[in-house]
Amino acid sequence: MVNSYIALGYKCNHNCLNCPLSTYDRLHGQLEPNIIKKNIKDLSVYGSNLHITISGGEPTLNPSFFDVLSILGKSNAYVTILSNATKCKDKDFVSKIIESLGYDYDLKRLRYITAVHSLHKSVHDRLTGTSGSLEETIKGLENLDKENFHVIIKNIMNKVTAKDMKETLNFLCNYFSNNIDFELCATDYSGRCGKNIDELYINFTDLQPYAEECLDSYEKDKDNCGRALEIIETPLCLVDPYYWKYFKTNNKKSLIYIAPNEESTNNISENTNSNCHTNYKECQECDVKEYCSGVWASTYNIEPNKEKIIRRIKSL
């Protein structure tokens, strides 16, 4: 499988406190339409062996969004869209996604991933910096759900979201159909998020009880809700080994990375690796590092007490 990531542009209709992009990126980072189409066409030759993640900013705002889907649909690629889903509150927009991919495209090959920070409007809208955003996102997810999209709702764990993470997951589990799965992930404190550390940062020692309580609640009701939950971009040592069954195996895969801030030819870099990794001295003697996604570099850099974010695990 050829893995690729393209940020169509950094324009966004939200103003999230935990956005890992800088203000400069958001003001200046847009790919030219001809660059987008050239790169997508070049990648589409991999056909059904291509998995591409489409992101931003908010990718649905980009004028080339539907053109990209059309090219990828014809090549039968696996597609992941990272979006706040607010544009999908319009049923016609969802229909245009299906039309662009092609009516013979298998929607099981597409994932639509959206963050819901809290079931409480006041919390979610404050984190997005956008009044009414929770209502719009939920409406968008409803429309995607009705069309049988494989939707994944993500909770980005930080000091604010951790407090009602369990209740938020329970609400979403009961609200949506079983087409919708869930992800939990650690926060990348880069960009604007780094300016809001006092409000958002929580070390993994303090996060652990919230995460385990959330997983315990999910396990209690999972037979009724019947969907998958996965933990990504988070170290295994966050929780007791009992919960490791929820973790995605490490993300030490190289990507073909296309983004406005890539200064190479056609804004493309090959063999790019994630900034969430185990390349820290504290991880080297851990017996499970090869299975672990590791810690965001931004987290490692801001936490002076490394024992609060990395705990070596020896021979289970």
Across the structure, where does each feature detected by a protein language model lie?
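Radical SAM/AdoMet-radical enzyme domain recognition
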Residues: 37-53, 62-185
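Disulfide-bonded cysteines in secreted/extracellular proteins and peptides
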Residues: 12, 16-19, 214, 225, ...
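Radical SAM enzyme [4Fe-4S]-AdoMet core and its adjacent flexible, acidic
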Residues: 122, 126-271, 275
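Flexible mid-to-C-terminal extensions adjoining Fe-S/redox cofactors in radical SAM and related proteins
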Residues: 241-316
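Short Fe-S-cluster ligation motifs
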Residues: 42-58, 307-316
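Canonical Radical SAM [4Fe-4S] cluster-binding loop centered on the CxxxCxxC motif
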Residues: 1-35, 46
